Amino acid sequence: MGVFVVLLSIATLFGSTSGTALGPRGNHSDCTSVDRGYQCFPELSHKWGLYAPYFSLQDESPFPLDVPDDCHITFVQVLARHGARSPTDSKTKAYAATIAAIQKNATALPGKYAFLKSYNYSMGSENLNPFGRNQLQDLGAQFYRRYDTLTRHINPFVRAADSSRVHESAEKFVEGFQNARQGDPHANPHQPSPRVDVVIPEGTAYNNTLEHSICTAFEASTVGDAAADNFTAVFAPAIAKRLEADLPGVQLSADDVVNLMAMCPFETVSLTDDAHTLSPFCDLFTAAEWTQYNYLLSLDKYYGYGGGNPLGPVQGVGWANELIARLTRSPVHDHTCVNNTLDANPATFPLNATLYADFSHDSNLVSIFWALGLYNGTKPLSQTTVEDITRTDGYAAAWTVPFAARAYIEMMQCRAEKQPLVRVLVNDRVMPLHGCAVDNLGRCKRDDFVEGLSFARAGGNWAECF
């Protein structure tokens, strides 16, 4: 395959809603779109935090998405999260245990709980599901179509972190990209298919800008867990009390409540290859409770990997410095988590490419977005009260790192400008940039954009890792 498998040991979201239960069923033909993402059950699925399937935020963008007529794109970097997956191993065990305890202890399972009588947990763990694979094929097609003046003749240089769901996501992106090209009568018919060019091992023995592992103090941090525990203690007991009243014989902890809520998104994305069937777990909770759940997951990521953790943003500094190198076509300067052996080799880190695609995990995307300063306007999130999306400066896990999340960093040349302009799109939302002078379309001059990444260029507070 020509893939470099590196084995080098070098180091609708927070707003309040009514308290009625939600139980819609979707039309599967309308559930997914290459350009708009997941379109079913938006009043619910947009409140699933990082377990939400990608949906376009174009309508929420403060700047227009279209490229002006007097400009043309000259460079694109896409950074994407893997597609929808089964729960992790530890979560799989926790979810199954909660369900088994209810089945064992409940003396009655009436009405909307009746499905639990014969429910058998069978989602597996860790890996992409068919819906997640389709999401990444759609991303490949979207990337091809959006930048077709380039993609008709140029292949992206593709990297992935070496976990099965991330690597497979990159492969599915390539597949979707090539399928779109083959359906384009204007494409170069002699252009070979792109491939996954570099797969970077994960773990504490490897420097890897697409997966955090080597910052010792960060890996030992409990800041995110503590924040999540604080808010869980605020909202979950009332839900547990309500459920216990409906389920005689059952006693539920706060963690049990969160486990049952998580079953809703995970099962929905696993039941069909387009997620058109809503899990019966979703009907067990009210709209107001889903608003609280969504905030919990956003809080967890903010304090775990974003601006709420003193060592969160620096986990993304290595990738930010790689972006600078690609934008400026100059060697990488970094002393954090960059793999210097890879990045010094033009075969594994070219500087002359036009299109780049990197694939990673949600947590890494959060750190990278903060290292880029995209959410510098987000103030510390309350650990006791739900804050509306307008108060978080556009940050929410469902808006930021849903399944198949994608950020596009575009560079464009415009007739009236001597220097190229840069803008950043997160899930189709053109981001208000910080640290550089932004024009009325959300763009900065490239050199100003790079200069504004002072936190990354200085290496952040990486020295505090050890």
Curated annotation (Swiss-Prot):
Q: Which reaction does it catalyse?
A: 1D-myo-inositol hexakisphosphate + H2O = 1D-myo-inositol 1,2,4,5,6-pentakisphosphate + phosphate; 1D-myo-inositol 1,2,4,5,6-pentakisphosphate + H2O = 1D-myo-inositol 1,2,5,6-tetrakisphosphate + phosphate; 1D-myo-inositol 1,2,5,6-tetrakisphosphate + H2O = 1D-myo-inositol 1,2,6-trisphosphate + phosphate; 1D-myo-inositol 1,2,6-trisphosphate + H2O = 1D-myo-inositol 1,2-bisphosphate + phosphate
Gene Ontology CC entries for this record: extracellular region
UniProt note: pH dependence:
Optimum pH is 5.5. Active from 4 to 6.5.
What is the protein's species of origin? Answer: Aspergillus terreus
Assembly, per entry: Monomer.
The residues responsible for catalysis, as annotated, are 82
What name appears for this protein in its UniProt entry?
Answer: Phytase A
Q: Does the keyword Nuclease apply?
A: no
Broad class of enzyme this protein falls into: hydrolase
- MF terms in GO: 3-phytase activity; acid phosphatase activity
Instruction: List all annotated glycosylation positions.
Output: 27, 105, 120, 207, 230, 339, 352, 376
Instruction: Keywords in alphabetical order, please.
Output: Disulfide bond, Glycoprotein, Hydrolase, Secreted, Signal
UniProt-listed Enzyme Commission number(s)? 3.1.3.-, 3.1.3.8
Q: What is its main location?
A: secreted
PROSITE patterns the record matches: HIS_ACID_PHOSPHAT_1, HIS_ACID_PHOSPHAT_2
Query: Where can this protein be found?
Result: Secreted
Q: Which family does it belong to?
A: Belongs to the histidine acid phosphatase family.
